[in-house]
Structure formats: C-alpha cells, structure tokens
Amino acid sequence: MPVGSGAESVAAESVAAEVVTEAPVTEPEPEDPLRGLEMRDLEAMRLRDLREMARDENVSGYSRLKKEDLILLLLKEKTERKGLSFGGGVLDVKSEGIGFLRSSRYATGARDVYVSQSQIRRFDLRTGDMVVGQVRPPKESEKYNSLLRIEAVNGIDPEFAKHRGHFKGLTPIFPRQAFHLITSPHNYTQRLLELIAPVGKGQRGLIVSPPKAGKTTVLKRIANGISENHPEVHLMVVLIGERPEEVTDMDRSVDAEVISSTFDESEAHQVEVAEMALARAKRLVELGRDVVILLDSITRLTRAYNMVVSSSGRTLSGGLDPAALYPPKRFFGAARNIEEGGSLTVLATCLVDTGSRMDDMIYEEFKGTGNMELHLNRRLEERRIFPAFDVIRSGTRREELLLGRETLRQVWLLRRMFSQMMAPKPSGAGYDIVAATEALLKQLRRTRTNHGFLDKLTKDL
C-alpha cells in the first residue's frame, strides 16, 4: 500500500460527507403579484392594466367587468390564494354597536357575516354600506362567519370611505337635470311622460293609480329608460307587498337591483327590507352617486308600518295610526338633488279607488309632499287606452328647470289645447278625457320624436 493512500482516502471520505450533508438547491418561488396589493393600489391602476393582470393570473370572467367589479374580483382571488374565504354584503348596524353583513335580499339570513364594534368604529361604517373582505368560519361557540379584514367599503378603500360626509348634512336643491327616458319612437309611455311630467335627478314623484291601470308597466318603462340612457345611475326597484310572480317578472324585465318582500311575508320583514334599501341608497349618495329608487308601493309600505309600529293611542280614519305615517314619509322625503354632488330620486306608486278607506287616507297624507305627480285614470283604463295618463292632473313642479325655454313654451301650448278639448261646449259637443287622450296619442303616433311632435303642433296653429 502506498504511503499517501491512507490520507487520500480520508480526504475523499470527508468530501463525500460534505456532499451528502449539503442542502439541496431549490428554485425560489415566483412572487405573487397580488400578494402585496391593496385596494388603493388597484384603484390607481387603469382598467386596461387591471385586465392584463387578471389575464396573467388566470382569473376567469374578467373581460366584461367594470373597473370596480374587476377590483373586487382581484381582491377575492388574492384572499383565496391565502387559504381564506372572501365575502361581503350590505351592513346592518344594530343598537348594540355590532353589525351583520346581509347577503340575502337585504334581510336576515343564515349566511350573514358578523362585524365587530371595533371595525365599525374604526372605519365609521354605517347601515347600508357594502362591505367586502376576508371572512373566517365560526368557532364552536359562534353562530355566524366573522369578518377578519375589510378590503373595500362601497367599492373604495376603507381608509378613504371613513372621511365621507353624512346624508343629513348634504344640501338639497331642486332637480336641474332631466332623465331621458325614451328608448324607442314607439314607446309612447316614456314619450308622453317626458312631456307632461318630466323626471329629473333628485325628483320626489308620486304615481297615483287605481287598480289595473298599468302602474307596474309604467315603472318598467321608466326603469328601462334609465338603465339604457343613464348607465351611470344606480337603479333600485323596491317591491313591497307584491305578488311573487310580479317580482320574478320585474327581475327579468329590467336591468336593475330588484329588492322585494312579497305579500306572504311578515310586515316586519317588509319594513326591514325597505329600510335597508333606503340606507343603501343614502350611502351611495354620500359618495356623489346618482341613485333612483322605484317603490311599489308606498301604500303597502305604510300598511306594513301600521302593523309594526307601537300604537300612539290615536287612530285616523280607516284604522290608520298616525305614528305609522312618519317612517314612509321619511322614506319618500329622502329624495333630493344634492348641491355637493349626487342625487336620490324616489318614484313611488300610491293606490287609490281600492274601496279601502285606509288607502284613501294614505293618499291624502302623501298628496302634495312630492314635487312631481303622475295620475293614471280609471276611465282610460276601462277603455284600454294606454298609457292611461291624466294629462290635466299630472305635472312636475319647477319644470322650467328641466325643460328648455322653447320646449317649455310648446308644452304649455299643448296643455292649453288639451284643456280646451275637455272643456264642455254650449252645444254639448265637448270632448271628455277619453276622446282628448285618444286624439293626443293619435298625433303622437304620427311623429317619431317629441321635438317633431311639438314642432308640428306649433306649425298647425
């Protein structure tokens, strides 16, 4: 055996040992682009960049989303990659200071998420806020899921949301911008409505209707006109005490947020849904948004309050408690155009000629509280003349703020002509409302636009 062979073998064994004990080299994990992103970072990005990020991260269903919806989708993807759940809903703050995120039609449900008092105080959260964030499942002694971290409030960064103003502190002014409701030359409901009772942003309107006069159809046409011509408006249809099949039909007919509590549900549930819908609208207006609520009907909402509120010890005609009038008046009175920006428009249907003294009393209490009224006529409905608008009784206060000077002059001329057609003649050959309305609709059908109709009316004189 050579002299150096022993030393060489020992060295070889030590090198082998080092090779065996050396940690294997691993490739570093690629950094997740979504990991460090917050709501404010995503808001600062352009829509094109957000879509590129969603495509690169293999997020499905992003191509047709608006910016705010795409941001929420990316936040959801970020949360789920951490192994957590992502949830949210409309906040309902209780008197104890805690809150719950309502996920089912603005009403209490088994999937509600608990929000702690500290989170509500930190971000100045209010009833009606749309809150989304990281959610954990309930522990053994808990009933609801709990909100761990708030990612967004009403679609914006929660740190910015806590600096918004309060609805009561905003300055109400008259409506100054009219809604364009016409979607087709053949939609005579919208065309006639824009002439006799224009609707502006911030309008407080009452649609007075006997049964079967087409009030639901009028609401649908208004909703379709707003959603098609004013996509920036947040449209809410609130159905209280309606039939379930009508709720389904409305949901399929309009591109709007449909909130409902049908007649077979309790009065307390109907009141809860209506109040949550109003609170949701107020929170959006505080952010400068334009919101429209179509309420069907304020009569049934008042009836529900009449069963829920504590008795005042007094009773009006028809069994109506005076205390039951204050909450629906507060709902209707919330409509306003905001000087600082934003508006809340409320168009509510009111039932008359139902044979109920209570319904007549409710109408008498709300008559004159709005700044726009649209009356539907029973005689026109009986003759199946639609839209069954009572032109003489319908109108908008301060319509000169919504119509141009020339259009206003022509509309006044139209009203004078309609009144003369209905005035009784000495010979007994005067027109009644049926003949006058038929003549008006006949002339309206001969033109494709309201401007053409008014110009033709002026030239014929």
Model-derived segments and spans:
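Charged, low-complexity terminal tails
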Residues: 1-111, 115
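P-loop NTP-binding catalytic core
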Residues: 125-127, 137-207, 213
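Residue-level signature of catalytic and energy-coupling elements of molecular machines
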Residues: 50, 70, 99, 116, ...
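Short beta-strands and strand-coil junctions in structured, solvent-facing domains, enriched
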Residues: 59-61, 107-109, 121-122, 138-141, ...
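P-loop NTPase catalytic core
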Residues: 214, 222-461
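Short, structured beta-strand/loop micro-motifs enriched in basic residues and often containing a Trp
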Residues: 109-117, 183-189
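Conserved glycine-bearing catalytic or ligand-binding loops at nucleotide- and phosphate-handling centers
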Residues: 54-58, 62-71, 85, 112, ...
